[in-house]
């Protein structure tokens, strides 16, 4: 009887809508929204009280007016599209290059020993230092910005692919080999699908970094994206409200991309379970 009670209790507790687990799960979905609204409310109070000068912290109403004006005339939307295009192309190129590279590092100790140190060293070079070199080598416009994004995203994609392949259950791989799976079939049907959650986590992190790389590239190499909008807001007469409006667009893009790729990752995990 005691054993039955112990077995039933957890299931009842999990199913109860008022249980701590259930309440915590519901709160987890709304926590980011509550936190964001709290920050905006605090910002509004500080601006209304005049604690900080407007050139340091503009009023949320001024930022909203600038943001809405930029969206209404299409300027900020067009800039966001340009930045997303460069970031997306860079992330795509990094994925195409990083997947086979990460797989090779995972499966070949020689490749890992040869390329590993250089991949780590590439992360020591800041994007601001690379951008002027790309201008000299390639020029201005979309292509050098895409190359910069590719370089930035490459490392997390390679590392996540390497870890995903190395952590596979070797018994599953050996069983597939015993069933007659060749190398290509093994990669396509077993290894990459099982490593997909780890790979998607790396791409999710990389895409967020890619947006940052696109903005830095646009500030240095020109263009019509959000980086150019930030540069214009930094002019001799700094438009702080415009800077905050562009930053708000960047935050929205980063959060949206993160949530979308997180959802894709969850769907992939459910499909594999």
Where are these regions (language model features)?
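Periplasmic/extracellular loop-to-transmembrane helix junction in inner-membrane transport proteins
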Residues: 13-25, 49-92, 232
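Glycine-rich helix-loop "coupling/hinge" segments at transmembrane-helix boundaries
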Residues: 135-137, 212-250, 269-273
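Transmembrane alpha-helices
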Residues: 147-151, 184-216
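Transmembrane alpha-helical segments of polytopic membrane transport and secretion proteins
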Residues: 1-35, 259-273
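Short helix-to-coil transition segments within interhelical loops
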Residues: 165-171, 175-195, 224, 236
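Loop-to-helix entry region at the N-terminal start of transmembrane alpha-helices
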Residues: 78-86, 136-157, 200, 242-249
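Cytoplasmic-entry segments and transmembrane alpha-helices of multi-pass inner-membrane transporters
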Residues: 99-135, 159-166, 174
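C-terminal transmembrane helix and the adjacent membrane-cytosol boundary/short C-terminal tail
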Residues: 109, 166, 197, 201, ...
